[in-house]
């Protein structure tokens, strides 16, 4: 759970094929070192990341999911109540890019009645000489799916991703505060109208 003023959990899930670097991105974003050895995630887990926005403290729980196909039905269980969904592909692996459509459609089906921020990350940009899909094409795909887009390398430049992640957090919090303020104003207007109607009925 988060320790922010709203008292609600700010859930962020990372989705994509096995080996694209979801775990690495999460770990470097919370200050851990990049690990050169690769071990595929075999369980769902989350890592808390704290951030200050407008002098308030917020905690976002970064959920690391299992990319293997045989675990996909299990992963779907954790889509609910996600505030931010980050789809990750490996820029050197065309299959991981092509399978983004599966992940996006899967989330859209599960969260059809929920509002959330989408982002697509092209990881392993340090291997640009082996690029299997152009950055321009990937960005156009992201835009067509209503998602933010960024290429980065968890290995060589983790700050690029960390800063991008903070931008997503800030966008979510500010939009949430805006919606809450708007709802509060509507409630005040409704209450004022009720009070006026009560006063009129008493006068009669």
Regions found by a protein language model. Give the residues of each.
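Conserved P-loop small GTPase signature centered on TRAFAC-class small GTPases
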Residues: 1-23, 27-31, 50-57, 111-204
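Preference for well-ordered, secondary-structure-rich cores of eukaryotic proteins
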Residues: 10, 66-67, 78, 83, ...
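Post-Walker A helix-loop "phosphate-sensing" segment adjacent to the P-loop in P-loop NTPases
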Residues: 31-39
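Switch II (G3) loop of P-loop NTPases
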Residues: 58-73
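Short acidic active-site motifs
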Residues: 70-74, 96, 137, 159-160
